[in-house]
């Protein structure tokens, strides 16, 4: 099995042979997570912010979905099934019964893009393997499925002792799986907010000040993706062609 890593961020091809054989892929889940903890299962940290109705990342998730369709998917060396055909496929919406996020205890920070079922794709930590494999039964014309999500963390940004400043870091995560449910490709890009917020003992004392930093970090992330992703994927495809020519 070959692994190819490209430049800053992570663009990893976990199996070049499997990736090269993909003829058509379907995006089966796009979502965002407004839990700012490092642990995807920890919904206690920043709980006040997550329950604040003014902290709404729906339009960020909408923009991410559009970015995926318009700027990211066309850069891959194979076609994708139309979103409308995926989300309207018989049985697709029932995948939510196999989703980790059908449980309100872990789903209240999860914001799915319009019409998509949110599916977990954290590898050994937490992954909806049954739903991923089931998707191939519902979409028999594809030999790969993609899950894409955006999430955020608070990161240190200078300061002394317990009075460290914090920034928001935004992450784009894209993963492709084969019919056995094995991940064969992953991409992770990130970008920070420009501005900072003060904290005491590592805890932000005014959670509402975080909201504009989340929007700023996502704007920076989307701009970076548009600028750098085409080159990264082109380089990856070139390496695949070299591998296959040996």
Give, region by region, the residue ranges found by the protein language model.
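Sec-dependent N-terminal signal peptides
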Residues: 1-16
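Generic alpha-helix detector with strongest preference for long hydrophobic helices that associate
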Residues: 8, 45, 49, 53, ...
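Short, intrinsically disordered/low-complexity patches at protein termini
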Residues: 16, 105, 207-210
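Active-site-adjacent structural segments surrounding the nucleophilic cysteine of cysteine proteases
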Residues: 20-21, 53
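C-terminal/domain-edge helix-coil "capping" segments
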Residues: 21-39, 126-157, 161-246
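N-terminal segment of the mature soluble domain
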Residues: 41-147, 179-186
């Amino acid at each position: 099995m070959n692994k190819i890593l490209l430049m800053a961020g992570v663009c990893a091809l976990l199996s070049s042979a499997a990736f090269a054989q993909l003829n058509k892929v379907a995006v089966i889940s796009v979502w965002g997570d407004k839990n700012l903890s490092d642990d995807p299962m920890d919904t206690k940290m920043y709980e006040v912010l997550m329950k604040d109705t003014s902290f709404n990342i729906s339009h960020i998730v909408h923009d991410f979905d559009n970015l995926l369709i318009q700027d990211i998917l066309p850069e891959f060396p194979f076609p994708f099934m139309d979103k409308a055909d995926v989300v309207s496929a018989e049985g697709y919406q029932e995948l939510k019964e196999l989703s980790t996020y059908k449980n309100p205890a872990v789903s209240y920070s999860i914001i799915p893009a319009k019409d998509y079922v949110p599916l977990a794709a954290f590898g050994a930590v937490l992954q909806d393997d049954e739903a991923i494999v089931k998707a191939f039964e519902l979409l028999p014309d594809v030999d790969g499925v993609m899950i894409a999500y955006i999430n955020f963390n608070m990161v240190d940004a200078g300061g002394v002792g317990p009075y460290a400043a914090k920034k928001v870091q935004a992450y784009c995560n894209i993963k492709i799986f084969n019919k056995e449910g094995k991940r064969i490709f992953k991409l992770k890009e990130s970008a920070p907010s420009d501005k900072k917020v003060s904290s005491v003992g590592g805890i932000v004392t005014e959670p509402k000040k975080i909201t504009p930093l989340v929007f700023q970090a996502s704007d920076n992330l989307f701009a970076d993706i548009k600028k750098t992703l085409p080159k990264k994927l082109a380089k990856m495809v070139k390496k695949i062609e070299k591998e296959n020519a040996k």
